[in-house]
UniProtKB/Swiss-Prot annotation:
It comes from Aliarcobacter butzleri (strain RM4018). Its EC number is 2.4.99.17. It comes from the Bacteria. Monomer. The gene is queA. HAMAP family: QueA (MF_00113). GO terms for molecular function: S-adenosylmethionine:tRNA ribosyltransferase-isomerase activity. It catalyses: 7-aminomethyl-7-carbaguanosine(34) in tRNA + S-adenosyl-L-methionine = epoxyqueuosine(34) in tRNA + adenine + L-methionine + 2 H(+). The keyword Nucleotidyltransferase does not apply. GO terms for biological process: queuosine biosynthetic process; tRNA wobble guanine modification. This is S-adenosylmethionine:tRNA ribosyltransferase-isomerase. GO terms for cellular component: cytoplasm. Keywords: Cytoplasm, Queuosine biosynthesis, S-adenosyl-L-methionine, Transferase.
Length: 340
């Protein structure tokens, strides 16, 4: 029996050939499933025609975070190879990272470009806190990003099951990516072309906020009671203009789950900057966002639970089943859905 508060209820079976490992071109030729809540109907279209389905009186919000080449390979000074994934910066030029390979507190890690790191702490979940240096000089975030963009790799999601390629540098960034800090792209926005963005800007105006997507976005919910899940936190900022437009907005379309969580966190706390750890689910529904544009998400993830916060568990599973039957492509490089 389905229970919206049980993780096992959010499971579904997806054929492997429907996991998108590369995007379609052009980007707006991706399929778009539109679910209209007032008529309880599903329409199949493409992103190119999205304006046909959007209400007139609408404020659109997007995430302008930029993905870092956050995956780097190196060695321990004592020998032995390691792989490091930068998750996010902390205070005082310290960084939360994930490391593949055994490393203890005090271990020194060596990388190209004379980059090194020293492990300062080990978190309960196995993450490490490190400091980065170049030629023994401690690095601030922007200096680190500059080096990572020379030696690092884009951290493609594990379900793509492939290494990053040159074309991903363009494909896995949004057209409006501006503020470095994410280790995953806000994927609903990968479907836009310059022309489509221009048309949306002319009709509605576009608003940008920032949430730096962290590695926690891929963390599975591994407890059966979803309300016991420890939600990850991610840094966000809402600028003055975006805040003004959000406050006076009549109807809000959030492009992606990251935008949804940012706006809903602001609606609950009135904070325009900080760490967002909001977990939206059927027991914690949206209060500010009216419409959602998003991709199709992993089973048992907080992201599919967020979708269910808009339309309920049963309707979410029904739509996903329809998308599978209609051969939609799933996950980061896949097709999308619009809830109106």
């Amino acid at each position: 029996m389905l229970d919206p508060l049980k993780t096992s209820s959010y499971d579904y079976n997806l054929p492997k050939n429907q996991i998108a490992t590369y995007p379609v071109t052009p980007a707006d030729s991706a399929k778009l499933l539109i679910f209209n809540r007032s008529t309880n109907t599903i329409i199949h279209s493409t992103f190119k025609d999205i304006l046909e389905f959007l209400p007139n009186d609408l404020s659109i919000f997007l995430n302008d975070t930029k993905v870092i080449k956050a995956r780097i390979f190196g060695v321990k000074d004592s020998g032995g190879q390691i792989e490091l994934l930068l998750n996010k910066p902390l205070f005082m030029d310290r960084y939360l990272v994930m490391i593949r390979g055994k490393v203890r507190v005090g271990t020194k890690l060596l990388f190209d470009e004379n980059l090194s790191a020293i492990v300062e702490e080990v978190d309960e979940d196995g993450s490490r806190i490190v400091e980065f240096f170049q030629d023994e000089k401690k690095l601030d975030f922007l200096s680190l990003v500059e080096i990572l963009n020379k030696i690092g790799h884009l951290p493609l999601p594990p379900y793509m099951n492939r290494e990053d390629e040159k074309q991903d540098e363009q494909n896995y960034q949004t057209l409006f990516a501006k503020n470095y800090g994410a280790v995953a792209a806000p994927t609903a926005s990968l479907h836009f072309t310059p022309e489509l963005l221009k048309n949306l800007e002319e009709k509605y105006g576009l608003n940008y906020l920032t949430l730096h997507v962290g590695a926690g976005t891929f963390k599975p919910v591994d407890v059966e009671d979803i309300l016991s899940h420890p939600m990850h936190s991610e840094y966000f900022e809402i600028g003055i203009d975006a805040k003004k437009n959000l406050d006076k907005a009549n109807k809000v379309l959030a492009v992606g789950t990251t935008v949804t969580r940012t706006i809903e966190y602001y609606a609950r706390t009135n904070k325009i900057q900080g760490e967002c750890d909001l977990f939206l689910n059927p027991a914690n529904k949206p209060i500010k966002v009216d419409y959602l544009l998003t991709n199709f998400h992993l089973p048992k993830s907080t992201l599919i639970m967020l979708v269910a916060s808009f339309i309920g568990l049963e309707k979410t599973l029904e739509i996903y089943e329809t998308a599978i039957k209609e051969n939609y492509r799933f996950y980061s490089y896949g097709d999308g859905m619009l809830i109106i």
